[in-house]
Amino acid sequence: MKTPFRDRVELFANKDVLKDHYEPEEIRERDEEIDQYANALQDVVDGWEPDNVFVYGKTGVGKTAVTRYMMDALEYEADDRDGVDSVTSVEVNCHHHPSSYQAAIALVNELRGDTDSDPLTTGLSTSDVLNALFDEIEAREGTVLIVLDEIDNLDDDDMLLYQLPRAKTNGNIEDSQVAVVGISNDYTFRNDLSPKVQDTLCEREIKFPPYDANELVTILDDRAERALSSGVLTGGVIPQCAALAARDRGSARQAIDLLRESVNVAIEDERETVTEDDVETAVRRVERGRIKDSIKDLTTHGQYVLLAVTQTAIADDTPVRAKELYEVYADIAAEYASDPLSQRSVHDHLNDLSMLGFLRQHDRNYGRGGGQFFEYELDVDATMVQEAIADADDATV
Ligand SMILES: Nc1ncnc2c1ncn2[C@@H]1O[C@H](COP(=O)(O)OP(=O)(O)OP(=O)(O)O)[C@@H](O)[C@H]1O
């Protein structure tokens, strides 16, 4: 039988090494941040109650990878030293558990994961869930580090962030100690916390800057060596992936995605080496994937507003004022049999789309009589947006 599958091309030695969830054997180019982290958590291995830590930096700059490495190192070190209490770390991603209540349930269930206890279900009162969490922490009779990744998604209240650091002072736990490690892409989250929570959660702050091209080359060299068969990459591929990612967001994730996608391009072409042309093709694919993912996260009307700017850009009528855009938007909403939102809401959507990197906002000030207003233009490729919205069509629009 003839099937659509290609013969296997042996470019990957271990494809998993280029997947996002892969935990690197070694952390590269983050010595300074690791030192700061070690200083912040030194008290744990010295037998004192640890400080809480707030880690921030843009997406893909190694916050999660370094935190996991630090937690492993801490657990290892505490095991290795005489007279030091055991260390348990537990990680929850607040993107998937966006309220204090949900995050607390997830933490209890993570902690119960390696015991015989049944998982908690929803329907319990907040104080029952919190008490279950204190019980789990107390049962460890040691130091428990609670890692809250993407902590800025905790959108309801500060309950968990207020209660956890005070658990010992308030007598909720006695034989254990607890510290919170909060990780965020968004520094403004810190400033929006109530002063009491800010003081405790941000006792130690560690900033992760974007990577430069040289640092990304080191990270990619390391990954490529483990992921790919030898001789697969031609000379310029890694520097090119590194330079493109450094110029854009300085994200290791973006650089690794580019490398993986470049290899895929060569494999689909049934070639045995990857070239710089493959990187060019990969850039468009990765960008399209990124746009598609972010578009999926927009509300339906957010997508209509983006489509309105896109159509205006294709007609070569951008930068455009919100007022002029409104009619295009209203027509699109009508096409989808949806009542248009108010002008004010469309303004808010334009603002959000600018913050998310879809649009560029220009502040026009024509002085007395001319007025002050914003104009918008597309900051991503129009064709890519159209393709992505067409793909998302079935699911959302
Ligand atoms: N210094 C590094 N050495 C090796 N690999 C790294 C390094 N920094 C990041 N990576 C890899 O890059 C990818 C993204 O890193 P990570 O998830 O830690 O970023 P992040 O800052 O937590 O991003 P986000 O805020 O989006 O979660 C992962 O695959 C990670 O293994």
Swiss-Prot record:
The entry marks the following residues as binding ATP, namely 61-65, 211, 223
Q: Name one Pfam family in it.
A: AAA_16
State the UniProt keywords alphabetically: ATP-binding, DNA replication, Nucleotide-binding
GO biological process: one example: DNA replication
* SMART domains registered for this protein in UniProt: AAA, Cdc6_C
The record's note on what follows loss of this gene reads: Not essential for normal growth.
Q: Do you know which InterPro entries this protein is assigned to?
A: AAA+_ATPase, AAA_16, Cdc6_C, Cdc6_lid, ORC1/CDC6, Orc1/Cdc6_arc, P-loop_NTPase, WH-like_DNA-bd_sf
Q: Where are the transmembrane segments?
A: none
**Among its keywords, does the record have Ribonucleoprotein?**
no
Q: Note the coiled coil stretches, chain numbering.
A: none
Q: Which GO terms describe its molecular function?
A: ATP binding; ATP hydrolysis activity
Q: Which family does it belong to?
A: Belongs to the CDC6/cdc18 family.
Biological role: Involved in regulation of DNA replication.
Q: What is this protein's name?
A: ORC1-type DNA replication protein 8
Provide the species name.
Halobacterium salinarum (strain ATCC 700922 / JCM 11081 / NRC-1) (Halobacterium halobium)
What is the organism lineage in this UniProt record?
Answer: Archaea, Methanobacteriati, Methanobacteriota, Stenosarchaea group, Halobacteria
Tell me the gene name: orc8
